[in-house]
Every structure is written in C-alpha cells, then in structure tokens.
C-alpha cells in the first residue's frame, strides 16, 4: 500500500462538477491522502496506513492529525502503483483490482473515523478533480 500525504489548509474533490468531499482547515491544517492499494498488500496493511495517517507528525509544529483533530480528505489513487521502468506506458499490474481496493479504502476511512478523525472522501472509480492548497509544501510518501 502506498500513500502520498500532503499537508493542506484546504482541499476538495469533485465528480462531474459536484464537490463530493472537502476539508477547510486554515487553523490546524489537514491531510490530503492519496492512497493506492497494492495487489500484494497484506491483509492488515490498511491498519498500518490508518495509524500513519493519524499519527505521523507532519502538520505545523510537528503535530499529527490526532494531536490537533485535523481533518483528512481520502482519495483512492491506484496510479501510485504504476510501474514506469520500461517503455512509455505505465503498467498497473501492481495495483489491486477495484473489487479488492474499494473495501480497503472504506476500511481506512472507517478506521480513521473510529479514532474521532473527520474524514471526507472522493468517489471510488470515478474520474475526479482534486484541488488543494498545499502548506509548506509538505508532502511525504508512505509505504506499508
């Protein structure tokens, strides 16, 4: 499982020009989490990802999402598993198929909510437009 976590002051995701998820957090900051589920991920990788999103100290002042009750915008991003070493067209064979990935993304969202974190989401499998105001910029790649 891979994720790109970006510290933001606001972020939104739209499908067909309709906003389906948004966070606005100029005081605490928040996290835009682009998460890709891999075909070879362990059954409990989602739990590690929940912990990383909630506890990594990547907000202002070395605070975590849990420390300051910051919101998360969670967007499924299978393209994080694209292989680009050969040729000009990425291979997506390392990404989990949709029927495997979608429930994992839902487990991550639920796991964050169970920690009391506000979670907004994109729409799985849809063509989405993601907008963000990055802070820093501060972006990290998480693999688990």
From Swiss-Prot:
UniProtKB keywords: Cytoplasm, Hydrolase, RNA-binding, tRNA-binding
CDD domains: Dtyr_deacylase
Gene Ontology CC terms, in alphabetical order: cytoplasm
Compartments it resides in: Cytoplasm
Enzyme class: hydrolase
Coiled coil: none
UniProt entry tagged with the keyword Cell membrane: no
Residue ranges annotated as motif Gly-cisPro motif, important for rejection of L-amino acids: 136-137
EC number of the protein: 3.1.1.96
Record-level GO BP terms: D-amino acid catabolic process
One annotated GO molecular function: Gly-tRNA(Ala) deacylase activity
Main location: cytoplasm
InterPro entries with a match to the protein in the record: Daa-tRNA_deacyls_DTD (IPR003732), DTD-like_sf (IPR023509)
Presence of the UniProt keyword Hydrolase in the record: yes
Catalytic activity: glycyl-tRNA(Ala) + H2O = tRNA(Ala) + glycine + H(+); a D-aminoacyl-tRNA + H2O = a tRNA + a D-alpha-amino acid + H(+)
Known role: An aminoacyl-tRNA editing enzyme that deacylates mischarged D-aminoacyl-tRNAs. Also deacylates mischarged glycyl-tRNA(Ala), protecting cells against glycine mischarging by AlaRS. Acts via tRNA-based rather than protein-based catalysis; rejects L-amino acids rather than detecting D-amino acids in the active site. By recycling D-aminoacyl-tRNA to D-amino acids and free tRNA molecules, this enzyme counteracts the toxicity associated with the formation of D-aminoacyl-tRNA entities in vivo and helps enforce protein L-homochirality.
HAMAP family noted in UniProt: Deacylase_Dtd (MF_00518)
Matches recorded under PANTHER family: D-AMINOACYL-TRNA DEACYLASE 1, D-TYROSYL-TRNA TYR DEACYLASE
UniProt record similarity statement: Belongs to the DTD family.
Record remark on domains: A Gly-cisPro motif from one monomer fits into the active site of the other monomer to allow specific chiral rejection of L-amino acids.
Subunit structure: Homodimer.
Protein name: D-aminoacyl-tRNA deacylase
Species the sequence originates in: Corynebacterium glutamicum (strain ATCC 13032 / DSM 20300 / JCM 1318 / BCRC 11384 / CCUG 27702 / LMG 3730 / NBRC 12168 / NCIMB 10025 / NRRL B-2784 / 534)
């Amino acid at each position: 499982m891979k994720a790109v976590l970006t510290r933001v002051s606001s972020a939104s995701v739209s499908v067909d020009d309709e906003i389906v998820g948004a966070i606005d957090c100029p005081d605490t900051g928040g996290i835009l989490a682009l998460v890709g589920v891999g075909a070879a991920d362990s059954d409990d990788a989602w739990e590690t990802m929940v912990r990383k999103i909630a506890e990594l100290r990547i907000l202002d002042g070395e605070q975590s999402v849990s420390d300051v009750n910051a919101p998360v915008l969670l967007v499924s991003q299978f393209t994080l598993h694209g292989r680009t070493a050969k040729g000009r067209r990425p291979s997506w064979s390392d990404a989990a198929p949709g029927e495997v990935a979608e429930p994992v993304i839902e487990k991550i969202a639920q796991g964050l909510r169970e920690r009391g974190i506000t979670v907004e989401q994109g729409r799985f499998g849809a063509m989405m437009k993601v907008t963000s105001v990055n802070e820093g910029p501060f972006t990290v790649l998480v693999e688990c």
